[in-house]
Amino acid sequence: MPRRPLICVYMMSNRKHGTLYIGVTSDLINRAVQHRDGEIAGFTATYGLKRLVWYEQHETIVGAIQREKSRKKYKREWKLNLIERDNPNWDDLLEQLH
């Protein structure tokens, strides 16, 4: 049976407490692989953000987009606290999703 794509808000980083990117996707695994492999030009490729360090699943893409917009307004400290709470070692969560 094929896997069901995960609709998520997610954060990528290059290292613990490094540069952060917040995005939204309707297929988290595919998108994280694209970031890791450098297939997406732009901010994540420029800064080498290849590690999926946080994600939050949503039922709809509309809900995920709304959450992404609010998360992007968060201060950096709040974003770091989200990651530290759910992923204190800043592991690459893509490995757990495969």
Positions of predicted regions on the chain:
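GIY-YIG nuclease catalytic motif and its immediate N-terminal context
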Residues: 1-57, 62-69, 86-88, 92-98
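Catalytic/regulatory signature loops of cyclic-dinucleotide turnover enzymes
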Residues: 72
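A short, polar/charged loop-to-alpha-helix boundary motif
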Residues: 77-83
